[in-house]
């Protein structure tokens, strides 16, 4: 079991709140059709839905990440997203340590076949590792969308912890100044 699968997720949610404080709702909702059909808000809502669904499914031992809500205030308003991130962080902090090794059944729609749903066995701590990776990768997309609007995301926003470690280990290397000095 990971020593602390909750802490890194809470840290990511706190990074998100700090980032959202720097955006207007117009920037948050902006869709750059040259790049994607999703806004920063769409990616943030997607990430926060995953945390919400994990926390909602934990007591029953069933998590369905596809039961997401779309076109909500979380997708359209920075303040609503920041509030949802705070609720998710609070929910994660409240997860008892005894529940981390708890078995879960995880559901999702399989492939691109309507009506096909797959499920597998997992554990709460494993799903928290998934959520951390999933969040970092969506934050990387958010960082790209922000840069396309001329915004500068925080230095480590959307950068995997292993990448940060690698870059920092290259003391004096130009690459460390490139990725981590931004923001």
Predicted regions and their residues:
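A generic secondary-structure signal for well-formed alpha-helical elements
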Residues: 20, 51, 146-149
């Amino acid at each position: 079991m990971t020593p602390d699968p909750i802490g890194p997720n809470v840290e990511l949610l706190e990074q998100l709140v700090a980032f959202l404080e720097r955006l207007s709702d117009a920037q948050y909702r902006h869709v750059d059709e040259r790049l994607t059909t999703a806004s920063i808000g769409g990616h943030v809502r997607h990430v926060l839905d995953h945390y919400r669904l994990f926390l909602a499914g934990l007591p029953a031992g069933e998590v369905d990440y596809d039961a997401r809500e779309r076109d909500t205030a979380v997708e359209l308003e920075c303040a609503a997203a920041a509030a949802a991130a705070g609720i998710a962080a609070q929910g994660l902090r409240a997860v008892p340590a005894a529940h981390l090794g708890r078995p879960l059944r995880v559901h999702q729609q399989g492939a691109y076949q309507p009506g096909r749903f797959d499920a597998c066995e997992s554990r709460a701590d494993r799903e928290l590792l998934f959520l951390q990776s999933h969040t970092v990768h969506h934050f990387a997309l958010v960082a790209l969308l922000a840069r396309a609007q001329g915004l500068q995301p925080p230095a480590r926003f959307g950068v995997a912890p292993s990448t940060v470690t690698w870059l920092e280990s290259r003391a004096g290397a130009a690459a460390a100044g490139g990725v981590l000095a931004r923001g």
